[in-house]
Amino acid sequence: MGDRAGRQGRGPIAGLVVAALVAAGCMAGGYDQGEPQQPAPPRSAQPESQTTRADGTTSVAEFKQDIQDAVRLAQRYWAEQFRASGERFTPIRRVVAYSREGEVACAGQGLPRNNAVYCSAGDFIAYDVNWSVAAFRQIGDAFLFYLLGHEYAHGMQVRLGIRYNFTIQQELQADCMAGAYLGDSVRSGALELEDGDLEEFREGLLAVGDDPDQPWFAEGSHGTAEQRSESFFRGYEKSLGACGLG
């Protein structure tokens, strides 16, 4: 997968930013319930014109590079969306890795293993590094771009003041937003997919889907694999306008 600065069209963001000033506090006490304090991984010094490619290796070095690339690409994408709408963009403060349950806390609550979350109280993304490396090796490097894109989308929901009554609505919208970020990045030339990357997205969504018997309205529901795939690829193919941002 690759990363090259690309120009985005005017997105459906402007009308939501004013509401965000009032509503952003709704999520300030906790974190999204994940798929699942250290400094953030250093930002890459690569020039913006360079294309990021996931080379398919499964080394720890490649994992770290893909995490950095995914965060940088998401930050650049959302900065462009806000800028195109004439709004100020504030990036998520940091991304932290952890390896033990409770090692990182959000609003006083220790984060569980085998997870990745966005903590609105601290405005950071945290992920279980052991779980993430295992998924990276089993599913592929494209999964990391989806995973970080999904969590980054939760941060954008907070900035836009988007809050639904049920968790599943919040989660499926974040899947759609992650799909839009990746699809738009591919179309603009900012991201270059390798053979098999789309299949890795599908496999990743299958891996994080809820049990089909999970109640739609249950707290913490994210959606079945089918629902999550539909939301992701709707955003991937149709961009942010298909994600119900306003």
Where do the model's predicted regions map?
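Short helix/loop segments within enzyme catalytic domains
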Residues: 68-71, 75, 81-83, 178-211
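C-terminal motif of bacterial Sec signal peptides marking the signal peptidase cleavage site
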Residues: 23-25
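Active-site recognition of the HExxH zinc-binding catalytic motif
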Residues: 78, 146-159, 175, 179
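Catalytic Zn2+-binding segment of zinc metalloproteases
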Residues: 152-168, 181-186
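Bacterial signal peptide processing site
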Residues: 27-31
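Catalytic zinc-binding patch centered on the HExxH motif and its immediate surroundings
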Residues: 100-126
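Short pre-active-site segment immediately N-terminal to the catalytic Zn-binding motif
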Residues: 129-146, 162-168
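Pan-zinc metallopeptidase signature
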Residues: 213-246
